[in-house]
């Protein structure tokens, strides 16, 4: 049944050690160029469930939803965690919001991160 398939998919996804983020091109290219070192997600139950208390090995950043042959639309980084911050950003409206700031520095080796 569809419910059983969905349950199996969720179990497999939970066992995954990779955090996947799909981004708009503007943000993907800024990360790839090293100009953007954090990707923001609203601090809400959806993202709390996916980030808090979880240990990931890799951060997979994708420009949209790339097809199998579009490797140039994927950035594969070690996962360095996140910080909870309050920011103001046009994407979230005019008021300050609480976010998960997921670390995504492509130049991490140059900065001596482990």
Describe the predicted segments one by one.
Residues 1-13:
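Short, Lys/Arg-enriched N-terminal segments with co-localized hydrophobic residues
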Residues 15-114:
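Catalytic phosphate/metal-binding cores of nucleic-acid and nucleotide-processing enzymes, i.e., regions
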């Amino acid at each position: 049944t569809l419910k059983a398939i969905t349950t199996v998919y969720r179990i497999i996804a939970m066992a995954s050690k990779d955090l996947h983020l799909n981004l708009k091109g503007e943000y993907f290219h800024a990360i790839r160029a090293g100009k953007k070192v954090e990707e923001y997600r609203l601090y809400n139950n959806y993202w709390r469930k996916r980030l808090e208390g979880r240990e990931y090995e890799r951060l997979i950043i994708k420009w949209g939803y790339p097809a199998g042959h579009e490797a140039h639309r994927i950035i594969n980084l070690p996962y360095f965690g996140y910080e909870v911050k309050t920011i103001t950003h046009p994407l979230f409206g005019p008021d300050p919001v609480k976010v998960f700031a997921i670390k995504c520095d492509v130049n991490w080796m140059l900065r001596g991160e482990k």
